[in-house]
Amino acid sequence: MTSLKSLFLSFFLVVALGLALVNASEPRGPKITNKVYFDIQHGDESLGRIVLGLYGKTVPETAENFRALATGEKGFGYEGSNFHRVIKDFMIQGGDFTRGDGTGGKSIYGAKFKDENFKLRHTKTGLLSMANAGKDTNGSQFFITTAVTPWLDGKHVVFGEVLEGYDIVDKIQNVPKGRNDRPLKDVKIVKSGELEMEADVANEGDKKGSHNEL
């Protein structure tokens, strides 16, 4: 009987150790520190809300720039601006709230700011990354990936991801377009702001001039 108990005990210890090793080996993603939203309208049609999580631990300056532009707390920002460039199976681009054509925009730090780091890669759909016109030319323009885009690694700073509303991103990438990949009807951010963080959202990441060109 004693040997049988020892056998069962050994079995449970092996199982527990195996589970611990699996959990320890799971890849841990960047921590989400802030959550912002865009309410989107296409022409006269309301598409709904996109909720975005920001990686404020990994890229704090870039995440703070986007957060403040989403709230408009500096007196300028994303509300009322359009997604001016949309390419199916690649990305949707917005954030030019000064000119609206991909040649404008500005950051909360001035016209442009440096590439903070390239620790994060473009490994999945729904990632939020900075559009730019070359090295250290970040302003306010951004894009959301609709494909895995490894050729952008080391050139564009990834700083967040879509938490809710990727179906809306998918609708945007499929709208009719004209010249320069611009939607024929405006795809507008009619309202934007910051949402209260919840504990599960905060830990989600741990579980898992010239045109700005990509």
Swiss-Prot record:
Pfam families for this protein: Pro_isomerase
PROSITE patterns noted in UniProt: CSA_PPIASE_1 (PS00170), CSA_PPIASE_2 (PS50072), ER_TARGET (PS00014)
Known catalytic reactions: [protein]-peptidylproline (omega=180) = [protein]-peptidylproline (omega=0)
Keyword field contains Ubl conjugation: no
Molecular-function annotations in GO: cyclosporin A binding; peptidyl-prolyl cis-trans isomerase activity
Location(s) in or outside the cell: Endoplasmic reticulum lumen
Superkingdom in the source lineage: Eukaryota
Residue positions of motif Prevents secretion from ER: 211-214
Leader sequence residues: 1-24
EC number(s) on file: 5.2.1.8
Keyword Endoplasmic reticulum belongs to the record: yes
InterPro entries attached to this UniProt entry: Cyclophilin-like_dom_sf, Cyclophilin-type_PPIase_CS, Cyclophilin-type_PPIase_dom
This protein's GO CC annotations: cytoplasm; endoplasmic reticulum; endoplasmic reticulum lumen
Keyword entries, A-Z: Endoplasmic reticulum, Glycoprotein, Isomerase, Rotamase, Signal
Activity control note: Inhibited by cyclosporin A (CsA).
Domain PPIase cyclophilin-type: 37-194
Glycosylated residues in this chain: N138
Major place of residence: endoplasmic reticulum
Biological processes annotated in GO: protein folding
Entry function: PPIases accelerate the folding of proteins. It catalyzes the cis-trans isomerization of proline imidic peptide bonds in oligopeptides.
Family designation: Belongs to the cyclophilin-type PPIase family. PPIase B subfamily.
Identification of the protein by name: Peptidyl-prolyl cis-trans isomerase B
Species assigned in the record: Emericella nidulans (strain FGSC A4 / ATCC 38163 / CBS 112.46 / NRRL 194 / M139)
